[in-house]
């Protein structure tokens, strides 16, 4: 579902890349972010020496506990990742807004990935689809596609606004109390960096 992201994470973990790296950005009721050896939020690279492409599938979402790639735009994944800590279930009204936002995010992705000689045509096509959705509502096909994710967000919460923007490649299955504890530490209001370092001791990979 997200093979390159999984390969990157396991590959770096096996080398000890993440050992001692701090969580440099922590926002309660949102997420905790790490993976940057410089601790600034501006460093890090993948096992391939640069960035790698996004990987999105309908079944992988930013639910509470999701392990996702941090990035600075399309196909800019390096070494940084975050764990979704938000656990506020979405409401029916939220769901309507998020389903529309997911559609916008997907259309924007089509625009971003369009070859230069097709960019204008793709932009116009995306704008036409968007205008249609604004006037007539989302298609039943899209609503059916989104329904499992909507139901899950209603149950466990998460950050649905990040779907189709950040690659999800893992899920915390136990130990969310540790994530919650990290999210609750005091931070600098300017950059959300913990006032006292919170670091990864090591990441163990079980083959």
Regions found by a protein language model. Name each.
Residues 1-207:
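Cyclophilin-like peptidyl-prolyl cis-trans isomerases
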């Amino acid at each position: 579902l997200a093979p390159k992201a999984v390969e990157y994470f396991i590959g770096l973990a096996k080398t000890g890349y993440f050992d001692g790296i701090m969580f440099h950005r922590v926002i309660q009721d949102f997420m905790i972010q790490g993976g940057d050896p410089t601790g600034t939020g501006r460093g890090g690279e993948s096992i391939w020496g640069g960035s790698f492409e996004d990987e999105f599938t309908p079944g992988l979402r930013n639910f509470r506990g999701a392990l996702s790639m941090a990035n600075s735009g399309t196909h800019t994944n390096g070494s940084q990742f975050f764990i979704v800590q938000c656990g506020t279930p979405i409401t029916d009204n939220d769901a309507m807004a998020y389903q529309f936002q997911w559609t916008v995010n997907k259309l924007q992705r089509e625009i971003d990935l369009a070859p230069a000689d097709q960019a204008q045509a793709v932009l116009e096509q995306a704008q036409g689809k968007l205008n249609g959705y604004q006037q007539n509502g989302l298609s039943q096909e899209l609503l059916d596609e989104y329904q499992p994710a909507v139901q899950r967000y209603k149950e466990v919460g998460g950050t649905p606004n990040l779907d189709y923007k950040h690659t999800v490649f893992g899920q915390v299955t136990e130990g969310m109390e540790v994530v919650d504890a990290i999210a609750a530490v005091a931070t600098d209001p300017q950059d959300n960096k913990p006032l006292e370092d919170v670091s990864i001791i090591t990441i163990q990979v079980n083959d």
